[in-house]
């Protein structure tokens, strides 16, 4: 949360707009590093196999591993797009192009970003 406050203060100082995005579907795309099993959800129980459990292939919203899987997927994407990870805060990503700067702050499934030039935000 402190990193977000710093970004807001920096954006105000630099005079650039901030944008916010909520990426709920990102939780459904994160890969899991370990095997995770869940019990049958209410209303979907198999009467013949009441104790059957399911192994998840992807992260599921509400799963304790979901935020980390989400962050790792988003981080890989941003690094492939030439962003640099923040040295002090690894949830901040920077993209410099000549005299322009784009800053992205990732907080669980929320993204706050702003730039010295609006065309970088597009």
How does the language model describe each region?
Residues 1-122:
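Long, low-complexity, charge-biased intrinsically disordered regions
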